[in-house]
A protein has these predicted regions:
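FAD/FMN-dependent oxidoreductases across multiple families
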Residues: 118-120, 216-291, 295-296, 303
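Predominantly flavin-linked oxidoreductase catalytic cores and closely associated redox partners
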Residues: 104-235
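Beta1/beta-strand and adjacent pyrophosphate-binding region of the FAD-binding site
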Residues: 1-12
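C-terminal helical "tail/cap" subdomain of flavin- and related membrane-associated enzymes
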Residues: 292-381
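Glycine-rich FAD pyrophosphate-binding loop
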Residues: 7, 23-42
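A conserved beta-strand/loop capping segment in the N-terminal third of enzymes
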Residues: 46-100
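N-terminal Rossmann-fold NAD(P) dinucleotide-binding loop
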Residues: 15-16
Length: 381
């Protein structure tokens, strides 16, 4: 039986960041990943500038496939273009990006075990027991960063309600010739489904394209996505992959005795844009900080003492996700009114992109919308 200070389950951004931080602070740490890295991931591969600011090391240039400072928005016959002086996101291949993050954790002293699927997590008086497809491990703290379908989360909370899960499908497609180069910027299409959006993101020799929808519109996602590809003259040459995204901003338990949830496993994702990497990195660091703080002082990592992690997450980004959820609900209930308002002026989109750059947040956007909505609505009627 392997015994550790910390077991991290999941080799995505949340898990890799948490494992690296724990190992750097001298905790005996192992990261368990069910796949063999690098492995494919359902993701557009967009990393916001705000997310990059949370990393203490720059992303290597060879991993970055495109830098984006131009946003093209489409809504029916309307189009809006926002050009910023600084990038608001970069595009990567998630398999390579995640592998790089795990390599950083390994270089910092974390042990990495691949191809071990966690099948059960049992907290007890002597620590937390983790059973995998191959072995049994114990640790004083387990950090569950194993995604939206988390096994670790079963020891913390009930499964996500279906109404609290958005859905997306995506694929990467070889580039085709067109009048306007794909590399000019990201393209986002609204209004083609009642609530949600479709995207085309440029990469080196292909484009990442997909469709994300709110919970009420998940039944016809694949058909709607294929119609979109046909309209754009894109032919799928890779598998279409789909998965759920938890709506952040909803109060859920994220800790139990000896257990911390991070990233999608904790429900930390942007309910307005679907961004998850930013909150995976943030929560991974906070999870590691909580584990290091308690274990280094020989404080029992029970539910009560780990509550500091939940409070830190709320103050760091949780309150802002609540504001994002409120704004996304407004779009869900009044899509035509709000999209009409957004596409009648550059200001709402420009303000929204500032969030991706880390210059503002959803609470400030909410206040901005309260102040400016009456005038914007008059101009859109």
């Amino acid at each position: 039986m392997g015994k550790y200070d910390v077991i991290v389950v999941g080799g995505g951004p949340a898990g890799a960041v948490a494992a690296r931080e724990c190992a750097r602070w001298g905790l005996e740490t192992v990261l368990l990943e069910k796949e063999f890295l690098p492995r494919p991931k359902i993701c557009a591969g967009a990393i916001s500038a705000a997310a990059m600011n949370l990393l203490d090391v720059p992303i290597p240039p060879e991993i970055i496939e495109a830098r984006c400072s131009v946003f093209h928005g489409f809504y029916g016959a309307r189009q809006i273009t926002i050009e910023l002086e600084q990038d608001f996101l970069v595009l990567v291949s998630r398999d390579i990006f995640d592998f790089w993050l795990v390599s950083l954790a390994q270089a910092s002293g974390a042990e990495v075990k691949q191809g071990e699927k966690v099948i059960a997590v049992d907290p007890g008086a002597g620590g937390v027991t983790v059973r995998t497809s191959g072995r049994v491990y114990t640790a004083r703290v387990v950090i569950g960063a194993d995604g939206v379908y988390s096994t670790v989360a079963r020891a913390v909370r009930k499964p996500f309600f279906k109404k609290d899960l958005a859905f997306c499908v995506c694929s990467e497609i070889g580039t085709v010739e067109r009048d306007v180069p794909w590399q000019e910027g990201v393209e986002v299409y609204y209004g083609l489904t009642p609530v949600g959006y479709r995207w085309i993101f440029p990469k080196r020799n292909r484009v990442s394209t997909g469709l994300g929808v709110w919970p009420s519109c998940t039944k016809t996602v694949r058909a709607a996505f294929l119609d979109f590809l046909q309209e754009k003259g894109l032919v799928v040459d890779r598998r279409i992959r789909g998965g759920h995204i938890p709506l952040g901003g909803i109060s859920r338990p994220a800790v139990n005795d000896g257990i911390i949830l991070a990233g999608d496993a904790a429900g930390f994702a942007d309910p307005f844009t679907g961004e998850g990497i930013r909150y995976a990195i943030a929560s991974g660091r906070l999870a590691a900080a909580a584990a290091v703080s308690l274990l280094s002082r020989s404080v029992p990592p029970n539910r009560q003492n780990l509550g500091v992690y939940e409070r830190n997450c709320y103050h760091s980004f949780g309150a802002d996700l609540k504001a994002a959820l409120f704004i996304s609900r407004l779009f869900q209930y009044f899509p035509r009114v709000l999209l009409g308002m957004f596409f009648n002026s550059r200001e709402p989109f420009a303000e929204s992109l500032q969030i991706l750059q880390g210059h503002t947040d959803y609470r400030q956007l909410y206040r901005w919308l309260l102040w400016h909505t009456p005038g914007l609505l008059r101009r859109s009627i």
